[in-house]
Amino acid sequence: MRVTIVLNGRLESLPPVLSVCHALAETGHHVHLITNLIEPENAGELREKGVKITTFRKHPDIRNTSLPVRACRWLSFRWQIWNLLRKEQYDFLWIASAETALLMGKRLLKERYVLQMHELYDTYPVRIRKLKPLAQKACLVFVPELNRGRIFRAWFDLPEFPVILPNKPYRHPRKRNIPLTNEKVKSVIEGLGRDAKIVLYQGGIGKERDLRPVARAVSELGSPWKLVIQGILMGNDEYTKDFLANYEYTLVPPVPAPKHLETAAHAYIGIAAYVHDSLNTEFCAPNKIYEYTGFGLPVIANDVAGLQDTIGRYRAGICINFATADTAEIKHCLEEIDTAYSGYAACAAEFYEACDLKAIIVTAFERLRNRK
């Protein structure tokens, strides 16, 4: 089938969309990716698989701007996309994010498309209201987590259950201690020493991802334990200022996906921290748990439902309430994993291998083909 993927944004900012590009290309579909930005290395690999890539002008940044400016940028994006699609022939559009669908507007309702949604948006009621007709009209809706599928089906009155497409990388090195190709990252990791037990957090740094309990525990354990953080600041609030100034950690510069997997290959334990402040975080679906477990890294996670149903269910690590656990309890988790490391690592690998992205996509597109 001829599939045109549309993404308003930088491809590497949504690793699951990169996985979709590879999976569709490798399962015999003719893929055209339309996006704002893509790293040259990723573009080269996709083109080798026959993926056509078109980039357009920078997507509209609507934050902190007046309503007239936002409206102009929305319309500019909409004009660019539909002008490109007018010249295309495709069987289906793959709308790669809810934001992309909203920016494309009601004209999308006249097309045959599938909709991939990454977040739950429970704190954005206006967005949910506007998404409802777009989700209802989609031939298929893809979401990354089972409970999100249940919630979306109820909210949007969907005629059928969404396809669960976990946020698992389509390609993963799987091998520990692979070479670090980014010189800055290499310098930092090698500077920690060969015997360092790296407790790694990859992702946004902010109050929604409270790392203070882990930082205190790792600090008290002392050498060879090291807390390493690779990510970007999610804000400049008091939490972030306090954490950056008063806690012990090693900061690694962020790199584009999938290069960040090189850092994870040198870790000992992964961290997944989500607070209980919304349905979106309660039923989280982080790609990092697959990125960690692909290397057999056990994970210490907060006890939100999305992590208990994955990491906890497979015993791929330990889930604990970061908000109430004291430093001694977090230390105990780290030491328990350290003591029974091979067992936790085997369970982590089992969790990773239990998901077959290609099979999910093949089955979903068979359903689409039968609807022609």
Predicted regions and their residues:
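Short His-centered aromatic/hydrophobic patch
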Residues: 95-100
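A short, active-site helix/loop in glycosyltransferases that binds the activated sugar's phosphate group
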Residues: 103-104, 125, 137-177, 309-310
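Conserved donor-binding/catalytic core segment of Leloir-type glycosyltransferases
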Residues: 4-6, 142, 169, 173, ...
